[in-house]
């Protein structure tokens, strides 16, 4: 009888919760209001800061409260080119400048935007990672929708009053920098709360994993498992529809022949 595998020791547990005690806060657009729907609201970028576990930098933006005396402090994801001391404008009448937030229906075709709302008022959920952006493709005035191209290349149709920030998310090319040493990877994954290092099953002893043991590193038996297998056996391809290389697909130039 072997030991319990790593996935068994983790247990079912609760829903994943991010370690938010060292994070700057929630980065999102202003809550939509009357002044942003019919005019513009001006904000000042106070500082640009690093958020642990996030690739893109964040900007602390201060707005003057249009309803009462006081200041509203917001946390925005930085667009590339945004700087400390810059004024940004949010609203339907905002101009097309880097960092401004306006409805995508007001953006000309071909405009590069980021932190796009999927539904009006959700404060931005599309194209938020470092270096990401979406492109405005076309507008439909009849049903008031706008079609955009997502970072994945897929196309999506949104309501034209969904807001977006003009520009590209800062921090592009972050993943191209080599890690070079294990200490950098250790701190990187610790900030993101990811298990690291991840040891392969074939590198373990047979007491630790179903794929362990042997005179050389090999599984030694089929890795496909049925869905009803007990937890100690579930290591490999669970209830796989198919395995192996996909053969017989369309090749380049096959359509021309």
From Swiss-Prot:
Ranges where the record places region Disordered: 207-257
Domain of life, per lineage: Eukaryota
Main location: cytoplasm
CC terms in the record's Gene Ontology section: cytosolic large ribosomal subunit
Pfam families: Ribosomal_L2, Ribosomal_L2_C
Keywords from the named record: Cytoplasm, Ribonucleoprotein, Ribosomal protein
Biological process annotations from GO: cytoplasmic translation
Compartments in which it is found: Cytoplasm
One annotated GO molecular function: structural constituent of ribosome
Functional description taken from the UniProt entry: Component of the large ribosomal subunit. The ribosome is a large ribonucleoprotein complex responsible for the synthesis of proteins in the cell.
Subunit structure: Component of the large ribosomal subunit.
HAMAP family according to UniProt: Ribosomal_uL2_A (MF_01320_A)
NCBIfam families the record matches: PRK09612.1
Protein name: Large ribosomal subunit protein uL2
Organism (species): Entamoeba histolytica (strain ATCC 30459 / HM-1:IMSS / ABRM)
């Amino acid at each position: 009888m072997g030991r319990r595998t790593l996935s068994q020791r983790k247990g079912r547990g609760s829903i994943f919760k991010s370690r938010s005690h060292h994070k700057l806060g929630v980065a999102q657009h202003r809550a939509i209001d009357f002044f942003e729907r019919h005019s513009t609201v001006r904000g000042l970028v106070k500082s640009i800061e690093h958020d642990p576990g996030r690739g893109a930098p964040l900007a602390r933006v201060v707005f003057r409260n249009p309803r009462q005396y006081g200041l509203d402090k917001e946390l925005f994801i930085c667009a590339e080119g945004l700087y400390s001391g810059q004024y940004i404008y949010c609203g339907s009448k905002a101009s097309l400048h880097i960092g401004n937030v306006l409805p995508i229906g007001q953006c000309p075709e071909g405009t590069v935007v980021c932190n796009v709302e999927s539904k009006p008022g959700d404060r931005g959920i599309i194209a938020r990672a470092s270096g990401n952006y979406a492109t405005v493709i076309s507008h439909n005035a009849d049903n008031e929708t706008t079609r955009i191209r997502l970072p994945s290349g897929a196309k999506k149709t949104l309501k034209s009053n969904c807001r977006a920030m003009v520009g590209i998310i800062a921090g592009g090319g972050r993943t191209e920098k080599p890690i070079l040493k294990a200490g950098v990877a250790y701190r990187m994954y610790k900030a993101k709360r990811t298990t690291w290092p991840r040891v392969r099953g074939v590198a373990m002893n047979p007491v630790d994993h179903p794929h362990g043991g042997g005179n050389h590193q090999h599984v030694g038996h089929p890795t496909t498992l049925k869905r009803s297998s007990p937890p100690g056996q579930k290591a490999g391809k669970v209830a796989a529809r198919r395995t192996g290389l996909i053969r017989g697909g369309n090749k380049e130039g096959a359509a021309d022949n």
